[in-house]
């Protein structure tokens, strides 16, 4: 039986992880579930999968959560102390589904603990942690398996084929919920428009990132770090059906494409089953059901956010600029969701923040957090000028 911890269990990805664990409960022993504020769902999940512990990061909700679990033997913790405890547990698999840079410090704690595998649904911690985080993981012999469908696809191909004779890695993009809109229509996009993704079930923040295609910029930087690949060997293509998740091309003109139905349960199952594979818990791919698979170049005019990742990789300080990009985007997306700014303002605010913040070399976790804090302050100030 594998021991598992789940961070961000009440989010969109976290809920899928819980569903899979529950469907094969005889295979997993859940040591701890961690959530931010959804105590009702957290308590329900804990009972469902027989978790030993739960952690709520909002300390003000500790007593209420404790009351919800009075009839159980489940231990309850809260706040920073609870998070430190959760990351120090001896587990085989840690599932990291916390959104944004908030996952970075817990990731660092996890790598320094006795965890063997971290399944990572959080691209921001790689973008911000960069080579520092991955070097620490290598030093501690911790395997990081990406849960993003695109990076998981590339990870699986490389696990089998390696980097030999590799010419290019192509990440696919669904195009998001606004693909068919023209630029003029995008001036009037609402929050509701952006969170209706045509293919994937996602949380609000990642749905907006998909709509701006800044998610693909973050994924380009993530791939740069995860796969130790040069920027010029990375590419993005729009693939609306989301059947092909990643493509590796070789110097002899051949390519290997990773294909599956668009279901996040597939990379989650892969990570939980690694180094083996388990029987599918979702529909299997039947290409006969598809009349066609389409591919197109991204429209840079409509979606300038997709260029940001490549532009960051061209700079002399990739690490700091990746942190700045991520911080500005998180602030801008939150402002858009709060209806303080328009949709097209998001990318403009990120560009403006990248132009205004000039941070030095990143040599430590404290540097990362400092650069992030400065960037958030600048992005917030830029937003205030618009409001």
Swiss-Prot record:
In terms of superkingdom, the source organism counts as Bacteria
What EC numbers are recorded for this enzyme? 1.1.1.267
Keyword field: Isoprene biosynthesis, Manganese, Metal-binding, NADP, Oxidoreductase
Catalytic reactions of this protein: 2-C-methyl-D-erythritol 4-phosphate + NADP(+) = 1-deoxy-D-xylulose 5-phosphate + NADPH + H(+)
Q: Report residues binding NADPH.
A: 10-11, 13, 38, 122, 124, 203
Q: Name one GO biological process term.
A: isopentenyl diphosphate biosynthetic process, methylerythritol 4-phosphate pathway involved in terpenoid biosynthetic process
One Pfam match, given by its short name, reads DXP_reductoisom
Where along the chain is 1-deoxy-D-xylulose 5-phosphate bound? 123, 149-150, 174, 197, 210, 215-216, 219
Q: Can you name one GO molecular function term for this protein?
A: NADPH binding
Which residues does the record give as Mn(2+) binding sites?
148, 150, 219
Task: Enumerate the cofactors the protein uses.
Answer: Mg(2+); Mn(2+)
By its UniProt entry, which Gene3D superfamilies does this protein fall under?
A: 1.10.1740.10, NAD(P)-binding Rossmann-like Domain (3.40.50.720)
EC category name: oxidoreductase
Q: Please name the InterPro entries in this protein's record.
A: DXP_reductoisomerase, DXP_reductoisomerase_C, DXP_reductoisomerase_N, DXPR_C, DXPR_C_sf, NAD(P)-bd_dom_sf
Q: In which pathway does it act?
A: Isoprenoid biosynthesis; isopentenyl diphosphate biosynthesis via DXP pathway; isopentenyl diphosphate from 1-deoxy-D-xylulose 5-phosphate: step 1/6
Specify whether Metal-binding is a keyword of the entry: yes
Q: Which family does it belong to?
A: Belongs to the DXR family.
Q: What does this protein do?
A: Catalyzes the NADPH-dependent rearrangement and reduction of 1-deoxy-D-xylulose-5-phosphate (DXP) to 2-C-methyl-D-erythritol 4-phosphate (MEP).
What the entry lists under PANTHER family is as follows:
1-DEOXY-D-XYLULOSE 5-PHOSPHATE REDUCTOISOMERASE, 1-DEOXY-D-XYLULOSE 5-PHOSPHATE REDUCTOISOMERASE, CHLOROPLASTIC
This protein is called: 1-deoxy-D-xylulose 5-phosphate reductoisomerase
């Amino acid at each position: 039986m594998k021991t598992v911890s789940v961070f961000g269990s009440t989010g969109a990805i976290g809920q899928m992880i819980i569903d899979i664990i529950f469907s094969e409960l005889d295979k997993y022993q859940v040591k701890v579930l961690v959530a931010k504020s959804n105590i009702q769902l957290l308590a329900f999940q804990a009972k469902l999968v027989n978790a030993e512990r739960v952690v709520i990061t909002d300390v003000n909700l500790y007593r209420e959560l404790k009351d919800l679990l009075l009839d159980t033997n489940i231990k309850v913790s809260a706040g920073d102390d609870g998070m430190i405890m959760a990351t120090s547990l001896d587990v085989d698999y840690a599932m990291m589904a916390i959104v944004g840079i908030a996952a970075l410090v817990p990731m660092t704690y996890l790598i320094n603990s006795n965890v063997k595998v971290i399944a990572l649904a959080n691209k921001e911690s790689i973008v911000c942690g960069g080579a520092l985080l991955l070097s620490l993981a290598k030093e501690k012999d911790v395997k990081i398996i990406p849960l993003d469908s695109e990076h998981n696809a590339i990870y699986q191909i490389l696990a089998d084929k390696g980097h030999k004779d590799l010419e290019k890695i192509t990440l696919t993009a669904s195009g998001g919920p606004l693909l068919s809109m023209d630029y003029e229509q995008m001036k009037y996009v609402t929050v509701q428009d952006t969170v209706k993704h045509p293919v994937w079930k996602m949380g609000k923040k990642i749905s907006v990132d998909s709509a701006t295609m800044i998610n693909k910029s973050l994924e380009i930087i993530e791939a740069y770090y995860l796969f130790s690949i040069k920027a010029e060997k990375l590419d993005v293509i729009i693939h609306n059906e989301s059947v092909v998740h990643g493509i590796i091309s070789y110097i002899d003109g051949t390519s290997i494409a990773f294909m599956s139905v668009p279901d996040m349960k597939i990379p989650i199952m892969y990570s939980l089953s690694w180094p083996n594979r388990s029987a599918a818990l979702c529909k299997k791919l039947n290409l006969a059901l598809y009349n066609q698979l389409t591919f197109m170049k991204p429209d840079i005019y409509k979606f300038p956010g997709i260029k940001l990742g490549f532009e960051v990789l061209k700079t002399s300080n990739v690490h700091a600029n990746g942190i700045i990009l991520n911080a500005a985007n998180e602030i801008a997306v939150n402002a858009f969701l709060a209806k303080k700014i328009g949709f097209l303002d998001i990318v403009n605010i990120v560009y403006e923040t990248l132009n205004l913040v000039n941070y030095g070399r990143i040599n430590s976790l404290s540097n990362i957090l400092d650069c992030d804090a400065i960037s958030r302050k600048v992005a917030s100030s830029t937003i205030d000028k618009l409001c």
